[in-house]
Amino acid sequence: MNPSNLEPGLANDSRLLVAAFYAFTPLDDERRETLLSSLPTLARNGSVLGSVLVAHEGVNGTISGPESAVDAVLDHLRTSFDLGDEHYARLEVKRSWAEKPVFRRFKARRKKEIVTIGVASVDPSTSVGTYVEAEHWNALVDDPDTLVIDTRNSYETAIGTFEGAIDPSTESFRDFPQWAESTLRPLIEQKSSKRIAMFCTGGIRCEKASSYLQQQGFGEVHHLRGGILKYLEQVPEAESRWQGECFVFDQRVALNHQLEPGEHSLCHACGLPVSAQQRELPSYIKGVQCLHCVDRFSDADRERFAMRQRQIDQRQIEQHKINRQQG
């Protein structure tokens, strides 16, 4: 993290709320543009950092900052939506805490989809699978007639997943429909499974994945409401079926069962998570290469990465000196 990029007033805060959220609720052009203009102002006034995607189908984001300021952004979103009694009409929020900023800036971006599956007919506001609360998840996945599917990408599943879950080994969520047709459908026929149980980080990908499977006649489809993050928040570790850490899309990289930063860090060359043990390998050079990308880049690339890392290290040293002088 580059401390010089942090918003004023955040650098010394010791406890920041991190809120991951989404809502599938229709937004017309006017309401979408209003959000795109109002959110940055509200975030700046409250020292809130993060990223929010805004589309005609709804919003998807993760933000961090002082609790009252984050709650003000969430309340603003709620009042901007037509939240009724339909299954999709809610702002799904997962809360965790951080000791330092996990984003460098705030961005609100206009998108075609808030999570991209690339199938125009998929609409969670029309059809989704059966929601499963975290407290009931263990009973569902323990049933031998349940086929458990991890809808996340391979770099996420590599550092943690639920016991017995099937890994589609996808590089992008766009790959899920093709995997479902080429691999999942034959697998269901082979195993004679009675139901599918799906999960993802916060629940949003399962909204679209379950909608797709419902459309394509895959039978009984269930998905974990609130995703892995809600499960880790509500289920005691002693009763948990979760193994490993949960990858998150901010500077914490991965969370353990206590929703605290885990042992993984990002390789800034390739952007993939690297465990503490993997950082001890001879192939690992901080900021330059890891076991995932040791043969991926040219010597010129690695020299450029090394120069960038030296600049980052120097800025951190300078910031540390400033903090000591101010302290």
Curated annotation (Swiss-Prot):
CDD domains registered for this protein in UniProt: RHOD_YceA
Organism of origin: Synechococcus sp. (strain CC9605)
HAMAP family, per the entry: TrhO
Enzyme active site: C200
Physiological role: Catalyzes oxygen-dependent 5-hydroxyuridine (ho5U) modification at position 34 in tRNAs.
UniProt-recorded name of the protein: tRNA uridine(34) hydroxylase
Biological-process GO terms, alphabetical: tRNA modification
Catalytic reaction list: uridine(34) in tRNA + AH2 + O2 = 5-hydroxyuridine(34) in tRNA + A + H2O
The keyword tRNA processing is assigned to this record: yes
Keywords: Oxidoreductase, tRNA processing
Residues annotated as domain Rhodanese: 142-240
Enzyme Commission code(s) on record: 1.14.-.-
Lineage: Bacteria, Bacillati, Cyanobacteriota, Cyanophyceae, Synechococcales
InterPro entries the UniProt entry points to: Rhodanese-like_dom, Rhodanese-like_dom_sf, TrhO, TRHO_N
NCBIfam families assigned: PRK00142.1-4 (NF001136)
A GO term, aspect molecular function: oxidoreductase activity, acting on paired donors, with incorporation or reduction of molecular oxygen
Protein family membership: Belongs to the TrhO family.
Enzyme class label: oxidoreductase
